């Protein structure tokens, strides 16, 4: 369906309408165009040649528009001058071997096609039909199916004049030349207008397609470039976030313990979690791919790039010192209100790895209660190497210890 829809969009309705109108005009051009015929006939009388020439004929609609010449011949019987009978014959002089032209009268109850075909079957090179009436009025005949026989119409007066010459014993020869092309000036201008409109619409369609394709290519390229840059910045920002290992005894493992908001799996001892700038934490293997694509906390939508100042550095071109969460190893006080702002409950917050009722002494590490070790000697906080994440194998490993 998508491919079909795309094809339909490539040929809009105005484009198809103009094309149909152009084809219609071209088909009507032949019907509205009229070709005249220059007729030159001559005869010999008293050792002198007489003749007449003029644009007195009209080619038929289905006639070849070409030159024809020969001896003018009438049907043998005056009753058959219309050539509507199958037994019609023409009075071709004996011994005449050249081309001849049949002169036939209009009417008689048969069609122009029948008249022309009967004359052509008997050897006529061309057919001249003279009109009825009392003047030289002519029109364009319709005679489909006459193949390559040249057919023209002349007026009644001129036709009877030639008939009288032949009946008087004169041998009349005729040359039919192609005259001028006549047509409605409105038809010519309409064809010109439709043709110009067709090419304008075609050029506009092609131009718009090129512009749209180039613009879409530029936008796609810019978007891909931006995504690569943001992914690189996210990779840099992830490297500045802390990693912690959950150990037996942490509050997050208790009866009210929470689960990872990404994979919906409960936390277990030895799970490695990554702590975001908003103090929400998640499984490292769950949150790292998420941050590479979205760069925000799944819980509160906090943007890690803006929180760490990386995005502003890229846009403003200034160098800003970025304190990481892992660099704040000592805090004098911890405000309960700050913890409530970051996580209203122990669910999916850094407070869930701490005792809710414990007091934090001055100089005590902020993550002192993240790992509980049942030994009297020391409490150890382990920061895992980033080698667990293939994207950060080049970073260093830091181990911090605190005396209880």
Curated annotation (Swiss-Prot):
One of its GO terms (molecular function) is zinc ion binding. Residues 62-166 form the PA domain. SMART domains: RING (SM00184). One of its GO terms (biological process) is protein ubiquitination. A zinc finger (RING-type) spans 260-301. Residues 336-356 are annotated as: Disordered. Auto-ubiquitinated. It is found in: Endomembrane system; Cytoplasm, Perinuclear region. It is a single-pass membrane protein. This is E3 ubiquitin-protein ligase RNF128. It comes from Xenopus laevis (African clawed frog). The gene is rnf128.
């Amino acid at each position: 369906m998508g491919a079909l829809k795309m094809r339909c969009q490539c040929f809009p309705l105005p484009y198809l309408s103009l094309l149909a109108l152009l084809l219609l005009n071209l088909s009507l051009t032949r019907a509205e165009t009229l070709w005249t015929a220059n007729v030159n006939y001559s005869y010999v009388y008293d050792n002198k040649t007489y003749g007449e020439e003029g644009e007195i004929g009209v080619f038929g609609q289905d006639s070849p528009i070409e030159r024809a010449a020969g001896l003018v011949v009438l049907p043998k019987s005056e009753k058959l001058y219309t050539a509507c009978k199958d037994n019609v014959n023409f009075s071709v002089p004996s011994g005449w071997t050249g081309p001849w032209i049949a002169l036939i009268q209009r009417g008689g109850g048969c069609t122009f096609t029948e008249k022309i075909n009967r004359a052509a079957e008997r050897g006529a090179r061309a057919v001249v039909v003279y009109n009825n009436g009392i003047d030289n009025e002519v029109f364009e005949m319709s005679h489909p199916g006459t193949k390559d026989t040249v057919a023209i119409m002349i007026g009644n007066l001129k036709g009877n004049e030639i008939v009288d010459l032949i009946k008087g014993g004169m041998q009349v020869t005729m040359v039919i030349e192609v005259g001028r092309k006549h047509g409605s000036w409105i038809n010519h201008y309409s064809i010109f207008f439709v043709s110009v409109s067709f090419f304008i619409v075609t050029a506009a369609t092609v131009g718009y397609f090129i512009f749209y394709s180039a613009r879409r290519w530029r936008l796609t390229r810019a978007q891909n470039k931006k995504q690569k840059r943001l992914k690189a910045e996210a990779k840099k920002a992830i490297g500045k976030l802390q990693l912690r290992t959950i150990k037996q005894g942490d509050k997050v493992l208790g009866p009210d313990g929470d689960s990872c908001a990404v994979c919906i799996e409960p936390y277990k001892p030895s799970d490695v979690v990554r702590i975001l700038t908003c103090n929400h934490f998640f499984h490292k293997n769950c949150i790292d791919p998420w941050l590479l694509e979205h760069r925000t906390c799944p819980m509160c939508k906090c943007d890690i790039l803006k929180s760490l100042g990386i995005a502003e550095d890229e846009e403003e071109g200034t160098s800003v010192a970025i304190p990481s969460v892992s660099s704040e190893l000592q805090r004098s006080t911890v405000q309960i209100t700050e913890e409530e702002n970051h996580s209203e409950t122990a669910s999916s917050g850094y407070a869930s790895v701490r005792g809710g009722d414990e007091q934090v002494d001055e100089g005590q590490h902020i993550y002192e209660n993240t790992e509980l070790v049942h030994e009297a000697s020391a409490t150890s906080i382990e920061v895992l190497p980033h080698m667990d994440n293939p994207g950060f194998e080049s970073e260093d490993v830091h181990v911090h210890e605190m005396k209880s």
